Amino acid sequence: MGLCCGSTDRVTKYSKEDIQQPTESEPLKYDPDFKGPLSKRSCTDLPCLFLFVTFLCAWGYVAYYAVQHGDLNRLLVPIDSDGRKCGVDSEVRDEPYLVFFNITECAKIDVPISGCSTTQVCVSQCPNQDFDFESANCNPSNVNEIRSKLICKQNVKKSDLTTCQIIRQYIKSQRCAQTMQKSTPLVNRCVSNIPEGQCTLIPKQFRQQPPITSTKFQTSAEQCKEQRELENILEEKISKLQSFLARYVNNLISVLTKNNSVHQLKYLNYHLVLQTLKKGNLKHNPLIITPYLITIHNITVLLTFQMIVEDILESWRMILVFIACSVLASLILIAMLRWIAKPLVWISIIGVITALSYGVYYSFRQYQQIRANPVAAHVNVSPNLSSLVNSWFKSDQTWLWILIALSVILIVLLLVVLVLRKRIVIAIALLKEGSKAVSASFSTVFFPLVPWILQAVVIVFSLLVLLFLASIGVPVYKVNGLNSSLTCVCTNGYMEGDICDPVAFNENCRDTSRIYDQERCLDAACHFQEVDTPGIVRFFHALNVIGFFWCICFVSAFSEMVLAFTFATWYWTRQKSRLPFFVLTRGVTHTVYYHLGTLAFGSLIIAICKIIRAILEYVDHKLKRYDNGFTRAVLCCCRCFFWCLESFLKFLNRNAYIMCAIYGKNFCSSAKDAFSLLTRNVLRVIALDKVTGFLFFLSKLLLASGMAAVTYTYFDSDLPKMQLNYPFVPAVLVFIGTFIIASIFFSVYSVAVDTLFLCFLEDIERNDGSAERPFYMSRGLQKILGKKQK
């Protein structure tokens, strides 16, 4: 700001006469002094800049307050299955670690959403040895030893576990763990710490088990004579399940043994599965196999995840090499688009039209065939999804609706192509010009790395502030379960629901039924209830959310304006070879010196829109439990409206930044000028937007798919020295990395095309190709428009 407003020799305000702008929607007039982005400009939207700086100071204070009063350790405290905080609540104050009864349950794909469903208990220390109840061969002579190794829930009295039968009942009811692995604490959670190369732990008879042949069996459905069809379906499915499971178990063992990563298998008791299959118990109770199938599935998911991680650790260097190659491939593709853009676009359009035409023809043939043979269109009622889908496609009405839908899409597409064919040609020409502009100022390709780093800083900062704010407050504990307990007595007058202190509760409340006076209560406790948070913290949370959205949008706007200045300078330079070498640096300095207020204004508008959309998503999530059709419809309409509004505002903001980069006007004036210019060329705008969007997506998809195919071919061949479990894992990672990198580079290309498009529209309105008013556009664009220099 000092350079902007405190130095008169650097900045000279321009008057309205410096640049001739039209009123309302009149075309732009010729200005002999206009040579591209103005060097004489002033600070824009200073009140918005002052507001933004003030907000940043307030956000900084929020961060300082959060760090001073918050404690992240409070958020990392584990909670057992009964809701007790390990090491915090009175019953588990001396047990700070959390152990899982069946860790394989935590390998399910929906765990981040639904949580880990296995029983979880607090313990004083993590298990220091492996334990499996079935393998321990429980008998009266070793029952005491087994009981000492058991890990059970807090309300279980181990002294009651006097026989093996009682222990089995407690394990079956999930009150004690059947298996336990040696583990170490990680963030106060006991995580398995198993050495590799324990393949020998698999029973010998299991490793040498011959393939099992399935036998057909009947179910009790034979008794239902009136449901013969259902019986046949059920019999077939169960028979297939038996055969599949037999092959699945043996194949699983073969694969896991080959990859030497089966140390967990000793906990699965696979021999029970094999015995069940061999004895034929499925004939009488086919559901007996269900728990074994679930166990096999869970451990398979866990081992698959482990092998994927092993593949990544083994191949990460080559993955980085292929991603680095994708950077080079992206640059080559952008440079080549000036030659391949036209055939790529037209081949894609013709391909889509051809595919739709064939779809219409095929749908019509199917419709006629089914109408002519109605007997063949029998609908098979079956619970099988594939059968249900097949029944749909045997209906003439299904093909009629498909025919109508494809015909409408085809007609609309043909009309759009016919009406916009000339505009599509112009859009392709601008794509070629964009490729030239990016190649002329090659540093712009890597410039998006700067805003990406800044956005990463904003995300990390806002997340840390969120976590520290969430940890602020005083924990509130209340007495729970005292009324229902017949043996727990508190000598200090604690009553049910009273606010309590865990230490005082342990000292003054005792279980009178226990042998020793010092035994704590098991049926009642001082439970953590909530965190008493100061009211100002909620306000700070709101400030943090606003700061996150505003700064993310601000950084994105900064990138767009800098690139717009660079590409506008390239367009309005007649001799492209004389383009300033540090044109990108000039764009940065002009934006920082003069237009941060404009960026703050535009980004605030987008941020408000995003916040409203986030609130609507939150409300929709909360109201899903209520089955109210009217409420859902209103929310759906609001979400759709604000999505459309945000998309329009993003489009308008980008063009406003381009106009501001050229003329140095404030946000409102720039947005008005850009909107007027675009509305006078609305068909060209539509064609350019759709063609460029489609081409960019196609290019990114083509590039990412090609690099993924090369990666998979490499790892699936004999070239690499490493042996991977899944060659597709590095291929998927390379696909994702390449797509992200291509998106970064093509974001520059997108700004280039939009900037050149606005400059092109101004060029054809300001100039006529005469000696006095020559065009700035290339000869290719002049030829397409049927214009030439006079």
From Swiss-Prot:
It holds the Pfam family Choline_transpo. One of its GO terms (cellular component) is membrane. It is a multi-pass membrane protein. Glycans are attached at N102, N259, N384, N483. It is found in: Membrane. GO terms for molecular function: transmembrane transporter activity. Keywords: Glycoprotein, Membrane, Transmembrane, Transmembrane helix. It comes from the Eukaryota. One of its GO terms (biological process) is transmembrane transport. Belongs to the CTL (choline transporter-like) family. This is Choline transporter-like 2. It comes from Anopheles gambiae. The lineage of its organism: Eukaryota, Metazoa, Ecdysozoa, Arthropoda, Hexapoda. The gene is Ctl2.
